[in-house]
């Protein structure tokens, strides 16, 4: 039987939340450290299902990892060559592990099988596989064409140095290729075919690669040039920023409840694009204060939360939180350019529409957009299905701040990125029940 969690109608206390480490940074950092020619001590690493899958894979590939504390470990780099050239890797539903490992292993070559949960086998990877094959990689589909599971064999250097890749389904494909090609020691040029979505995630990749000694030339997000003789050299210590996507729930809570909420672990100089979520809240009624290591959101009670019509391509994960904020506006709100939601942990446009309707909202879906007209009062005790999607669970917790109780099915799906989320959320709230 599915476990559920009832959140009573609640008010928010003025609060400060220490964010868990960023998933995007944690998994990129683990792989780059493993491929470096020296050791790297990583601090504030996210402890979650997705990072566990990456750590398990690196262990199977022969990477030496010392666990120094719960959120601190030392990765001993392999010099860009994994010791184990044969492995069977289960990667769950962790796209930030599956895509970059696919590219790294395909470029290095070996005898590898990569697979995951059923949903991972429904998430496309064909655009990445096509690009890797142009670079001489041996990538074979073991099930449906263009989808995992995959077998990876030996790469044959065919001399091709210009690699086209599509970026309109997932920016993780480009991230994976960028991180992998320096392992060849050859100069490469990656050329985008069509639109590149979620550019801020590419910025994270490029900034982290630079911290590990590889400078990529970015020509307007159309062409990326990787220098010859590149190799990864890790910083001795690296501190992982807090997760800006996870920050969105607490910052939105401050706006909805008109109560100051501060998150620590990110700030004005964060390398994560999702910090722009706070700027979007400011446009619709929030007061935002930025520090070097914090962001704080509040709202005067007399100021209404304004409706919005937003192109959310730059903040695809955090934009989900705005779908719940829409319920506090009293007017129709629209999120556009969110086609990537369709191929995430679930079809997030369909899932969000289904669950918002349970609350009494009128919702219209398009291929890459969602229009939300809130009810006067959300339906109390609506039972929200979460589709094994951590962000669905965390988003809908905010409904309890709209003066109605809500029931969240499978709350433990948050273990993917934020295992303690509901404990933290409950500690910030007061209930009348």
Curated annotation (Swiss-Prot):
The keyword Ribosomal protein appears for this protein: no
Chief location bin: cytoplasm
UniProt entry keywords in alphabetical sequence: Amino-acid biosynthesis, Aromatic amino acid biosynthesis, Cytoplasm, Transferase
Residues at the active site: 317 (proton acceptor)
Entry keyword annotation includes Cell inner membrane: no
GO cellular component, one term: cytoplasm
Binding site for 3-phosphoshikimate: 23-24, 28, 170-172, 198, 317, 344
Localization annotation: Cytoplasm
Listed CDD domains: EPSP_synthase
InterPro entries documented for this protein: Enolpyruvate_Tfrase_dom, Enolpyruvate_Tfrase_sf, EPSP_synthase, EPSP_synthase_CS, RNA3'P_cycl/enolpyr_Trfase_a/b
Source taxon at top rank: Bacteria
One GO MF term: 3-phosphoshikimate 1-carboxyvinyltransferase activity
GO terms, biological process: amino acid biosynthetic process; aromatic amino acid family biosynthetic process; chorismate biosynthetic process
Catalytically driven reaction(s): 3-phosphoshikimate + phosphoenolpyruvate = 5-O-(1-carboxyvinyl)-3-phosphoshikimate + phosphate
E.C. numbers: 2.5.1.19
Pfam families for the chain: EPSP_synthase
Protein purpose: Catalyzes the transfer of the enolpyruvyl moiety of phosphoenolpyruvate (PEP) to the 5-hydroxyl of shikimate-3-phosphate (S3P) to produce enolpyruvyl shikimate-3-phosphate and inorganic phosphate.
Family recorded in the similarity comment: Belongs to the EPSP synthase family.
Subunit details: Monomer.
The protein's name in its UniProt record: 3-phosphoshikimate 1-carboxyvinyltransferase
Organism: Neisseria meningitidis serogroup A / serotype 4A (strain DSM 15465 / Z2491)
Phylogenetic lineage: Bacteria, Pseudomonadati, Pseudomonadota, Betaproteobacteria, Neisseriales
């Amino acid at each position: 039987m599915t476990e559920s969690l009832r959140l009573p109608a609640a008010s928010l206390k003025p609060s400060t939340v220490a964010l868990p480490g960023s998933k995007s940074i944690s998994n990129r950092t683990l792989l780059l450290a493993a491929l470096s020619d020296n050791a790297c001590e990583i601090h504030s690493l996210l402890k979650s299902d997705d990072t566990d899958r990456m750590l398990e894979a690196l262990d199977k590939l022969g990477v030496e990892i010392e666990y120094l504390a719960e959120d601190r470990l030392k990765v001993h780099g392999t010099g860009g060559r994994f010791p184990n050239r044969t492995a069977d890797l289960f990667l769950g539903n962790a796209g930030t592990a599956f895509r970059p490992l696919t590219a790294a292993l395909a470029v290095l070559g070996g005898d590898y099988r990569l697979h995951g949960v059923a949903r991972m086998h429904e998430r496309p990877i064909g655009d990445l596989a096509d690009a890797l094959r142009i670079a001489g990689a041996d990538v074979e589909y073991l099930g449906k064409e263009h989808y995992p599971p995959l077998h990876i064999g030996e790469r044959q250097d065919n001399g091709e140095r210009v690699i086209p890749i599509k970026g309109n389904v997932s920016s993780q494909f480009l991230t994976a290729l960028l991180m992998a090609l320096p392992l060849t020691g050859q100069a490469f040029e990656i050329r985008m075919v069509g639109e590149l979505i979620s550019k801020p995630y590419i910025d994270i990749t490029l900034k982290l690669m630079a911290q590990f000694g590889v400078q990529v030339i970015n020509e307007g997000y159309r062409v990326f040039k990787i220098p010859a003789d590149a190799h990864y050299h890790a910083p001795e210590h690296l501190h992982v920023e807090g997760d800006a996507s996870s920050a969105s729930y607490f910052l939105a809570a401050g706006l909805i409840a008109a109560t100051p909420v501060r998150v620590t672990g990110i700030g004005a100089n964060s390398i994560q694009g999702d910090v722009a979520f706070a700027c979007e809240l400011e446009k619709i009624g929030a007061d935002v204060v930025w520090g070097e290591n914090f962001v704080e959101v509040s709202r005067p009670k007399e100021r209404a939360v304004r409706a919005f019509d937003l192109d959310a391509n730059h903040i695809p994960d955090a934009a989900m939180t705005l779908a719940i904020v829409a319920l506090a506006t009293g007017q129709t709100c629209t999120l556009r350019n969110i086609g990537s939601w369709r191929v995430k942990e679930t079809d997030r446009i369909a899932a969000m529409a289904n669950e918002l309707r349970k609350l009494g909202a009128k919702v219209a879906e398009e291929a890459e957009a969602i229009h939300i007209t809130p009810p006067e009062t959300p339906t109390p005790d609506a039972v929200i299905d979460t589709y094994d999607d951590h962000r669905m669970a965390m988003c809908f917790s905010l409904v309890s701040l709209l003066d109605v109780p809500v029931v969240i099915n499978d709350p433990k799906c948050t273990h993917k990125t934020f295992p303690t989320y509901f404990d933290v959320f409950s500690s910030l709230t007061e209930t009348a029940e």
